[in-house]
Amino acid sequence: MQDRNLIDVNLTSEMKTSFIDYAMSVIVARALPDVRDGLKPVHRRILYGMNELGVTPDKPHKKSARITGDVMGKYHPHGDSSIYEAMVRMAQWWSYRHMLVDGHGNFGSMDGDGAAAQRYTEARMSKIALELLRDINKNTVNFQDNYDGSEREPVVLPARFPNLLVNGATGIAVGMATNIPPHNLAESIDAVKMVMEHPDCTTRELMEVIPGPDFPTGALVMGRSGIHRAYDTGKGSIVLRSRTEIETTQTGRERIVVTEFPYGVNKTKVHEHIVRLAQEKRLEGITAVRDESSREGVRFVIEIRREASATVILNNLFKLTSLQTNFSFNMLAIENGVPKILSLRQIIDNYISHQKEVIIRRTRFDKDKAEARAHILEGLLIALDHLDEVIAIIRNSETDVIAQTELMSRFDLSERQSQAILDMRLRRLTGLERDKIQSEYDDLLALIADLSDILAKPERIITIIKEEMDEIKRKYANPRRTELMVGEVLSLEDEDLIEEEDVLITLSNKGYIKRLAQDEFRAQKRGGRGVQGTGVNNDDFVRELVSTSTHDTLLFFTNFGRVYRLKAYEIPEYGRTAKGLPIVNLLKLEDGETIQTIINARKEETAGKSFFFTTKQGIVKRTEVSEFNNIRQNGLRALKLKEGDQLINVLLTSGQDDIIIGTHSGYSVRFNEASIRNMGRSATGVRGVKLREDDRVVGASRIRDNQEVLVITENGFGKRTSATDYPTKGRGGKGIKTANITPKNGQLAGLVTVDGTEDIMVITNKGVIIRTNVANISQTGRATLGVKIMKLDADAKIVTFTLVQPEDSSIAEINTDRENSISKNKDN
């Protein structure tokens, strides 16, 4: 026989229905605030319970356990811990912009410390919390039964200030969450008043009085576009940054001092994170981290090494730690019983509607009360005007019921009026008492007329709302804590995290690249042996050396005619003797593709200029720099090469420069680049020099008549020759002799133009570097051997060289051969 207590249901339907019921219960009754008073049910019940318990600001604190127990027993049967945690949060200055609970005892800290147990702490309502409940006993809001029908609780509080804006809200429901930031009380009230005075105002106009959130912990909001988007749509994101200062100690060291943290950031966790970053070498230059916070305020100190840059470290801290965070707006609240994403204007409109209803209901309550009292006084005045007759009726009546009936019949009184006459004491029969009653009656009639006028005129209701909010503003408002920064600083560029310094970039023949400090090498006299400076093996050698800054962009041109780009700081830093990192780990090179030329391409120096390409077979091409603004990660084609040809080097030119090209067999040709039109990236180019048999191009440079041509041969010989010895001719010729090539000095390793003041760094295939001043190299004619500038071992050859400014000049003025580029001495 079937059990009548069992009901067959479809599991899918039951799961769907039950989950929806549960979700709506969590959404409406637990997790989301009401747009009218800005409170979740638990907070509303705590404040109402404290008010009913008499734990007001003018009374002593009461044990937290008593408060949570009372709230749990009467209104919120969900466990004392959730109630206590909600009450604790309302008592924390770093959580609420205006605390609603005045806590006494340990209520936690912004370091993440929890509050003491509720049996140890005490609490009472704060003064401003009373403004949320003011007039609640005047029928201003609806009440509902509690969970078991034994008590009545308010559906919403009167909320005489816009609490949802002032204290914000956070909460996670089922399938949705809310995150509304706190705001300044004065600004929030001004925004409400602005909407009442100018109903057609825009979000931009509202932001003139409420420019953005005002977090209790202060800090900085970086940029305002995110605020406008959030206020306009209810969703958006802003960047919060700690307020910091860079102090200089008496010893000359710098330290970073944090005085304000972003909202919701745990100071202790930030401390631990910074220490961990320093220990893991992810953030260098920090010597100590101390929390010197006290009752006077927050002070978080980060000590910096003497040689480190506090600004760079601070930028790294902003990127790597919670000293800079994002706050995401999701202004979700309950409107008319339904969860809804609300704009700033919608929040204010809902609050104004609520306040209008509160004022109307309060006015009706006061009017009804005044009318009831006036009705009684009217009866008393009638009795006093007919005192002897009233006394006679009362004396001649056998019972009070008969007396009441006779009075009602004789003077046309109501039951309440006649009862009031019977209850009147004899002392009120004096003439003085009659005057008091008359005065009170007249005042009540005036009050009733005024209250009726309020109900009849909506503009008076608006005026009352504004006046009462102004009074709250006068009593409780305080200055803004969060500073709104003008301009968008929403993200840190990588350059902000890297200290700008002058460095050397070296690239070996086998493709190992590294970055090292430029002052690693000292200048030596001509003929010095040099220092071992590149950490290469016997079968490898340095092929390229570029002097640059860590913030500069480097363009890598390959033998395949492609170009890649890297920031100098993206190249790993190694010690002087370290091997470096294979370039293929940084650039997506194809099989057989090698870097031929590296050019420093600072924007301010490349604007309006061209790249001048020279190939191994003497082909040249000119292309505007702007064609290379957007270089993909896998590179970009710089020029089209003929079969068997390779790119040798690239120059940065103005479009009117003279160019000189040198060949391996010691010949050179000079011509003006204007004879070559600008071509696209996919073009092949035109003939620049007609090569002799078995010859190839080894270098190209810009040239002016007031310069000198510096050539260096493979066996360590070099010389300077006046540029006037090299006449300008048309491109495509075989050229003239630029050096007397013999077995003693060897073939030409490279050719550049110099002013005579530069230092030169010469590199051999053994990785030996020598630095000397160009002035130490003799001036001779074109067809000469030159002088010995570097002592070489028997099997050593010079492979390349580069120019740098002398050591006694400012390092900021270092010129990394932006006018010259030297090809690699590679037999291919």
Curated annotation (Swiss-Prot):
Organism lineage string: Bacteria, Bacillati, Bacillota, Bacilli, Lactobacillales
Topo IIA-type catalytic domain: residues covered: 32-497
UniProt subcellular location: Cytoplasm
Protein name: DNA gyrase subunit A
Species: Streptococcus pyogenes serotype M6 (strain ATCC BAA-946 / MGAS10394)
Biological processes per GO annotation: DNA topological change; DNA-templated DNA replication
Additional detail: Few gyrases are as efficient as E.coli at forming negative supercoils. Not all organisms have 2 type II topoisomerases; in organisms with a single type II topoisomerase this enzyme also has to decatenate newly replicated chromosomes.
UniProt entry tagged with the keyword DNA-binding: yes
Enzyme class: isomerase
